[in-house]
Regions:
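DNA-binding alpha-helical recognition surfaces that contact promoter or target DNA
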Residues: 226-227, 247, 277-278, 289
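Conserved structured core elements
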Residues: 218, 239-242, 273
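A secondary-structure capping/hinge motif
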Residues: 230-234, 279-288
Length: 302
């Protein structure tokens, strides 16, 4: 999809020359006098347990562009074949992102700063997939982007050049798909009860206690927490909070009118102030602002 939006119409909701990713499944671009394309591609059925989607993001940002993104509970493998860009989080100085990298879980909003040609292709991976591919301890990848050259068995330069030189979207996605397929034996052999725990939390939209997850899988809480840190990178409690935030964001984004008390009950918050506090921990606006922004954006997206 291509978005062409004027920030003049959105000035009450957002500063110019910025984009915000709205939850795990919704990215909108609102930049003055610019055209951006962000397109998702679904994996083949064999890969759906391990891959959420593929994506291609292309465009131009001659005057500079900031992208803010909240946590979404996924990992990613990314190939940047455009101009270099930087990333920052928690008021840390921006750092240049590797041209090919793996990222783990993010626990707070991060900001990308781009200028020039934007050309990025990537894979959004399910929470356990990186560990199942490489055996990595995922707690070491939290809030970070590790160059693919650190991971064994990957012909990084060949892959990066192949993605860059392939002109068709379908060709780029095929390269990424074949890469994951080549790791399927390793991925499947490393599936464990923690993969089941992640799936159960996802099914519950994060509205589940750690004790209930452990009881459901007939394992101890201590074992669940220890192995979850290894395979996912964060605690099961924190992961559930991220999933609840994602489900909540999706609910707010797609309702014309909101019954806040109903949402408080549905997502197991103590009260509305608890909901707002939790939402703002993962996003940089409150739920009402988020709802207004999404309604405004849907009026202008073509």
């Amino acid at each position: 999809m291509t978005y062409k939006l004027s920030t003049k119409k959105l000035s009450s909701c957002a500063p110019p020359h910025k984009t915000r990713e709205l939850g795990a499944n919704h990215s909108f671009l609102y930049i003055q006098s610019a055209i951006m394309r962000y397109q998702k591609f679904q994996p083949v059925s064999e890969l759906k347990p391990f891959v959420e989607c593929y994506f291609i993001w292309e465009g131009k940002a001659h005057s500079g562009l900031q992208v803010q993104s909240p946590p979404n509970a996924f990992c990613s493998m990314v190939f940047n074949y455009g101009d270099p860009y930087t990333a920052s989080q928690n008021n840390a100085p921006p750092m240049e992102v590797p041209k090919a990298f793996l990222s783990g879980q993010f626990t707070a909003n991060y900001t990308l700063e781009l200028k020039g040609m934007i050309a990025v292709a990537g894979i959004v991976l399910k929470p356990c997939t990186v560990h199942n591919m490489f055996g990595s301890r995922m707690s070491e990848l939290v809030n970070s982007r590790a160059a693919l050259s650190f991971f064994p068995g990957l012909p990084v330069d060949i892959l990066w050049s192949a993605v860059k030189n392939e002109t068709a979207d379908e060709g780029k996605i095929k390269i990424l798909e074949q890469l994951i397929i080549s790791y399927l034996p390793a991925i499947k052999s490393n599936i464990s009860i923690i993969d089941e725990a992640v799936e159960y939390i996802d099914t519950c939209k994060g509205c589940i206690s750690v004790e209930a997850v452990a009881e459901k899988l007939n394992i101890s809480r201590r074992y669940l927490e220890k192995k979850f840190l290894e395979k996912v990178g964060v605690s099961p409690k924190f992961y559930a909070r991220i999933k609840r935030f994602g489900a909540l964001s999706n609910k707010i984004a797609h309702q014309e009118k909101i019954d806040w008390q109903e949402i408080v009950l549905e997502f197991d918050f103590h009260d509305q102030s608890h909901l707002v506090k939790e939402f703002m921990e993962f996003n940089q606006m409150n739920p009402s602002q988020y709802h207004l922004l999404h309604r405004e954006l849907t009026r202008f997206v073509k």
